[in-house]
C-alpha cells in the first residue's frame, strides 16, 4: 500500500503522522509512503479540497492507495484497525 501525507513545516501532527508512516515502512514490506511539504510544493488547502472533495481546514491530509483517510488521528485509527498497529 502507498500512503501520501500532505503536511507543512512546524506542524506537530504532520511530524507525528510522518513518524508513524516511517515506523510502518520499516516494519512492513507492503507499506510505503511519501511526505509532501505543501509549502515547498506550492500546494494550497484549496488545492487539497479539490482532491478531498470537502473543505480542508487542517494538515496533515493523508491518503492510502488514493483513498482519503483524514488527519493524523484518523491515520492512527486507520493503522490500528487495518494493520493491527498497537495491538
From Swiss-Prot:
Keywords: Deoxyribonucleotide synthesis, Disulfide bond, Electron transport, Redox-active center, Transport
CC annotations in GO: cytoplasm
InterPro entries for this protein: GLR_AS, Glutaredoxin, Glutaredoxin_subgr, GRXA, Thioredoxin-like_sf
Molecular function GO terms recorded: electron transfer activity; glutathione disulfide oxidoreductase activity; protein-disulfide reductase activity
Transmembrane among keywords: no
Claim: Electron transport is one of the keywords in the record: yes
Glutaredoxin domain ranges (all copies): 1-87
A Pfam entry, by short name: Glutaredoxin
Disulfide bonds listed in the record: 11-14
CDD domains recorded: GRX_family (cd02066)
Biological-process GO terms, alphabetical: cell redox homeostasis; cellular response to oxidative stress; deoxyribonucleotide biosynthetic process
Described purpose of this protein according to its UniProt entry: The disulfide bond functions as an electron carrier in the glutathione-dependent synthesis of deoxyribonucleotides by the enzyme ribonucleotide reductase. In addition, it is also involved in reducing some disulfides in a coupled system with glutathione reductase.
Family: Belongs to the glutaredoxin family.
Assembly with partners or alone: Monomer.
Protein name listed in UniProt: Glutaredoxin 1
Amino acid at each position: 500500500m502507498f500512503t501520501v501525507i500532505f503536511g507543512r513545516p512546524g506542524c506537530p501532527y504532520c511530524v507525528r503522522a510522518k513518524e508513524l508512516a516511517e515506523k510502518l515502512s520499516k516494519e512492513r514490506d507492503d507499506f510505503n509512503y511519501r511526505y509532501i511539504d505543501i509549502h515547498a510544493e506550492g500546494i494550497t488547502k484549496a488545492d487539497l479540497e479539490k482532491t478531498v472533495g470537502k473543505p480542508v481546514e487542517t494538515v496533515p491530509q493523508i491518503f492510502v492507495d488514493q483513498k482519503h483517510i483524514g488527519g493524523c488521528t484518523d491515520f492512527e485509527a486507520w493503522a490500528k484497525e487495518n494493520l493491527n498497529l498497537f495491538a
